[in-house]
Amino acid sequence: MMTWSGNQIPAAFTTVKGRKPSVEIHKRRVSIMSVINELIRTEANGTLSFGNYSLAAKSKVEDFEHEGDLYKVKTFKEITKIERNGMFVYESVPGTAVKDFAVTDTTVTFKVEGFEDAQITVQLEDDCEYEVFEDGVGVGGMKTNMSGKLSLSVELNEGREVEVKIVRK
């Protein structure tokens, strides 16, 4: 991901029809998260990144090893799905790029980007309540169903990532 702020923002991102950018644009932080070209990878901080919503055709990687588990990812513009040891972990419709995906006993965190708003489903603990945050703002409590799936909608725009945090109550 590339991050700029203030006067560091390249001219290509700030000029509007030959005019100087507004102060608001100059002060705004701009983040650009790229898709995961290799479809899945382990980050230096030990988290997973996966998904490429820019692909026209479905692509997949199987048997990707991470911390002793085998992952399978399928991704393209219509869907991104990842499984761990044959079990469901994450799915988005339409497809997304996910960065820094991490799971603990009580929390799931990740950054997500896509072309448009996405319906995201994650596997959690069965029949439990969770608090969901998007970019640090609480969007409400949600309860998983009997199979442990939690679904949420995330407003996405290409070039802007949203930080999602799901915490068990």
Task: Please tell me what each predicted stretch does.
Residues 2-6, 11:
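Extreme N-terminal basic, low-complexity initiation segments
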Residues 12-14, 18-97:
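Catalytic cores of secreted or luminal carbohydrate-active enzymes
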Residues 59-84, 92, 118-120, 144-169:
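C-terminal beta-strand-rich structural cap/linker in extracellular carbohydrate-active enzymes
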Residues 97-100, 107-110, 141-142, 151-155:
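Beta-strand-rich interaction surfaces with strong enrichment in secreted/lumenal proteins
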Residues 104-106, 119:
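Non-catalytic accessory regions flanking glycosidase/transglycosidase catalytic cores in CAZymes
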Residues 111-128:
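Surface-exposed beta-strand/loop patches in extracellular or lumenal glycoproteins
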Residues 129-133:
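Surface-exposed interfaces of beta-sheet-rich extracellular modules
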